[in-house]
Amino acid sequence: MGAMAENLLVLCTILAARMALAAADDWIPATATFYGGNDGSGTMGGACGYGNLYDQGYGLENAALSTALFNDGAACGQCYLIVCDTDKAGRWCKPRGAVTVTATNLCPPNWALPSDGGGWCNPPRRHFDMSQPAWERIGVYRAGIVPVLYRRVRCWRRGGVRFTVGGFDHFELVLVANVAGSGSVAAVSVRGAGTGWLQMSRNWGANWQSLAGLAGQPLSFGVTTTGGQYILFQDVAPAGWKFGQTFSTSKQFDY
């Protein structure tokens, strides 16, 4: 991406944030810190199970959510537009700063610290522990923590939805990633060559499980996002698939 395109993208993000601020009721107060180092390498992996965030299409604009936001993994993949609250911490906010992040991890509570003195992710606090590169789009490094305003926004992804089939023997653990629209998944079903549609259950994060023992069968998936859109992904994995393989599709969600 050229410098002009990058500048245009930043400008569009900022304009979207500032225009949206006019509808103040849509914005929710929270706080934000950062982790993972200045290169963001420490944010790879995480409680959503995405692993390498570059490979899965999320990159460094990511965040770990406090328990109140993470919702036992149901928020994995959701996108949030975040701006620094200049009314509360003007000198610690970057001018015209705004960033959109994807939920990729859980920021666990720290019960050894008070919620207003280091236990930023303790319930019922709404808190984003962002990658440092993303956080520095909105806050001055020395601040460490800033008050923010956030709102859910539509996720934009390159390419189609991806399925990684993990597990062993009669246990399939399927990671659903690179989801646009709502970003998060509400339900997944799977069908083999010799079965009807089987409802899968969330195992952890963005991983969905089945105990049907479908090894050796071509796999199709039906996915419903939290926005209510359903897409059928026909014959995603061929009969000879192996555990650990990732399959990309050409279909993508709008909401």
UniProtKB/Swiss-Prot annotation:
The keyword Secreted is assigned to this record: yes
CDD domains attached to this UniProt entry: DPBB_EXPA_N
Cellular component per GO, a single term: membrane
Gene Ontology biological-process annotations: plant-type cell wall loosening
SUPFAM superfamilies: Barwin-like endoglucanases (SSF50685), PHL pollen allergen (SSF49590)
Protein name according to UniProt: Putative expansin-A27
Signal peptide: 1-24
Name of one Pfam family that matches: Expansin_C
Compartments, as annotated in UniProt: Secreted, Cell wall; Membrane
Described function: May cause loosening and extension of plant cell walls by disrupting non-covalent bonding between cellulose microfibrils and matrix glucans. No enzymatic activity has been found. May be required for rapid internodal elongation in deepwater rice during submergence.
Membrane topology: Peripheral membrane protein
InterPro entries given in the database record: Expan_Lol_pI, Expansin, Expansin/allergen_DPBB_dom, Expansin_CBD, Expansin_CBD_sf, RlpA-like_DPBB, RlpA-like_sf
